[in-house]
């Protein structure tokens, strides 16, 4: 069976509305792509992660009247009358296999690998985290996750306690445990993330050393040797007082989910409490790390 695809550019704000509308008028699937044509496979728990200008890509049955689809979109007022779009025919494929083929084992730092379950482990002697794309944000494919994993690999986590603030899939907490941490604590606002983290921890044999809490249920006076938060710049600034208290004196802090253009404002929220390192950038994203002063 052949398909026809329409691709149109949208603002972040309107992308989900357009997606819902396209599904209502017959799209068999709708995906989001960023401006670099990279599929966004990693939704935050409870929402769709979008950044920059977003392309909405919808797949229809090949017999669909695409002129009518375009006309209906215009009438919906979700797009401008002269909105740019591209329509192309798509050959039939084994889409599940195509999707799986896009994921490969990835190395972070010197020791750490993230491996999909259907791939052969490249180095059995390395620190291997088995993780499949699934319920929650975090598989290693996004630059912010990569920045955080590389940082964790650089630390001596032996017998340390690590807090993963905004744990998503649990990838960072699980990686920390596999890298030698004694205990990890994952905190997230969404129950979906807690479920995903628990499942992934069980697959990796570290569930007995991982505690998980919804934000509203987290214990008072939590504190750790290492705190990592891969969320977004806004929450990192708003929640700075809370995040700062989670780090022991002389403990390590790692922050990401931050665009390079937002780094300065995030640093200002933490610089009085931490001796901050040089900012590390990857593509348009960055990582902020530091050691707590007291």
Curated annotation (Swiss-Prot):
<comment type="similarity">
    <text>Belongs to the methyltransferase superfamily. PrmA family.</text>
</comment>
<dbReference type="GO" id="GO:0005829">
    <property type="term" value="C:cytosol"/>
</dbReference>
<keyword id="KW-0949">S-adenosyl-L-methionine</keyword>
<feature type="binding site">
    <location>
        <position position="188"/>
    </location>
    <ligand>
        <name>S-adenosyl-L-methionine</name>
    </ligand>
</feature>
<comment type="function">
    <text>Methylates ribosomal protein L11.</text>
</comment>
<feature type="binding site">
    <location>
        <position position="230"/>
    </location>
    <ligand>
        <name>S-adenosyl-L-methionine</name>
    </ligand>
</feature>
<keyword id="KW-0808">Transferase</keyword>
<dbReference type="GO" id="GO:0016279">
    <property type="term" value="F:protein-lysine N-methyltransferase activity"/>
</dbReference>
<feature type="binding site">
    <location>
        <position position="166"/>
    </location>
    <ligand>
        <name>S-adenosyl-L-methionine</name>
    </ligand>
</feature>
<dbReference type="Pfam" id="PF06325">
    <property type="entry name" value="PrmA"/>
</dbReference>
<dbReference type="GO" id="GO:0032259">
    <property type="term" value="P:methylation"/>
</dbReference>
<dbReference type="InterPro" id="IPR004498">
    <property type="entry name" value="Ribosomal_PrmA_MeTrfase"/>
</dbReference>
<dbReference type="InterPro" id="IPR029063">
    <property type="entry name" value="SAM-dependent_MTases_sf"/>
</dbReference>
<dbReference type="InterPro" id="IPR050078">
    <property type="entry name" value="Ribosomal_L11_MeTrfase_PrmA"/>
</dbReference>
<protein>
    <recommendedName>
        <fullName>Ribosomal protein L11 methyltransferase</fullName>
        <ecNumber>2.1.1.-</ecNumber>
    </recommendedName>
</protein>
<keyword id="KW-0963">Cytoplasm</keyword>
<keyword id="KW-0489">Methyltransferase</keyword>
<feature type="binding site">
    <location>
        <position position="145"/>
    </location>
    <ligand>
        <name>S-adenosyl-L-methionine</name>
    </ligand>
</feature>
